[in-house]
Amino acid sequence: MHYKARDVFAPIGLNVYKENDNLDIYIMSDKLTDANNLTLQVSLIDFKGEVIKSTQTKVTAKANVSEKVLSLSVKDYVTEEQQGNSVVKVELVDNKNNTIAHSNYFFHWPNKLNLPQTNIEQSTTYADGKYTITLKSNYLAKDVFVEIPIQGAQFNDNFFDLLPSEKKVITITSPELLKSAKTPFTIKHLRETYK
């Protein structure tokens, strides 16, 4: 839960909201000055990684305000079938292509999505006090959860969506983590819980 709260309290954030027949994208800024020269990248991606549609729009994150910057007609943007098999990936990037904020929007609750079976590839670097795990999946892995049997271990992120072919780096820190011990951890995603 606190991983989502971190995103909510970031100085600049994105919110994707479906109202009536529109998909509205908002930029929320707590900064006291405008952030200019930003690009809003919006992509419709199926769960196997095919980019169905992609658009880019120049935007400004106005100071200390929440503002709708894009509105898409759902019926013109995505078919009924695609709604159960795709995600809208929204990113706000600066002029150096650094991601300022991101958000993934699913048209249905997870139990109504056609989540694919997938395996998450991982590579791990072990150091005393810190494990660094790089994750990648060919298909969408929804609600990925990493767990390690050490009380109080700190994660830089957890319980996230791993989009097809994207890499995600997770760091786990704790004084109890030893390079030589290679303490085992588990990685699960929502589709693995289906029977």
Predicted segments, located by residue:
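Carbohydrate-binding surfaces of carbohydrate-active enzymes
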Residues: 1-136, 141-156, 162-172, 177
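Enriched for extracellular/lumenal, surface-exposed ectodomains of secreted and cell-surface proteins
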Residues: 90-97, 187-195
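Extracellular/lumenal ectodomain signal focusing on beta-strand-rich modules
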Residues: 143, 184-187
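Short, Lys/Arg- and Gly-enriched loop/turn segments at beta-strand edges
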Residues: 177-183
